[in-house]
């Protein structure tokens, strides 16, 4: 069992990583006998895990209710968020309740925002079931729902009480979802850790076949990197923005193509290559390193080009709504070398459009 702490003073919390955690009541810190819980999951995961998690909590004396939501990025919305509030109010659940997010990034983000909002804030626990949510979205307290005009535009910074990563969940993950998570894994190597990127080049095949020790190390390293960044810059005033490599381009793809048609990691993968091409055009990044990135993404089964249905011009309206925009100026996360990156303002639209055009599908 691995345990990492996200250090935020009185709001610090553990990330527990191991196989078989759903069998252990002690995994679900800080729940105790007599607590009230609302389990939030989706229609795909409920048959797989809901009864198992409910059972282990009830055997520990926890009072458990549940709400099952539709599955998909398109349901990460205010309308579906209201379903959670209604379920909480009907029981009813008070300020001493705990929401448990049992699912991937959509469930985690939506449940976290529900917890931040319900009766001005209640406790919640992240139980991520996808690789993407285990290495990224469950850690750090970013919670949100989407708006038709932009991804994650309505939300709050709100930290969980704990994160429970059961490696066994990856056994039921579709191959496309596994690849989507690997985009975020590869991102960490590009922006923060050249040695980890090199390790990924040598161990990607092991990750694709869900090798236990390799996957445990991979998730632990990603969580360590994320925890260090969040501890230093919880509200994304500087360093934390680096975690958005590829996301400004990727969010444009998700919004333009319709949420759910491109998985988040797929869009981020294409966006990472666009960011690398932009950095190349600015003389900040080598074409050799871009090719290393492309090769690793392709081995992971990820796209390295944007959708053929989008022109370069289609990206800009979405990118100009990005949360990093200041005074109407685009700010992009750009790689400088494998393991090093920066947030750069003043990147011209010409450079951005050229980088996108370099990465458009024929």
From Swiss-Prot:
Where along the sequence do coiled-coil regions lie?
Answer: none
Residue positions annotated to bind NAD(+) are 71-76, 105-109, 129-130, 142, 151, 169-172
Provide the residue positions that the database annotates as binding Zn(2+): 184, 247, 264
**Cofactor mode of binding and number, as noted:** Binds 1 divalent metal cation per subunit. Can use either Co(2+) or Zn(2+).
Q: What is its EC number?
A: 4.2.3.4
Q: Which Pfam families match?
A: DHQ_synthase, DHQS_C
Q: What's this protein's name?
A: 3-dehydroquinate synthase
Q: Which organism is it from?
A: Salmonella enteritidis PT4 (strain P125109)
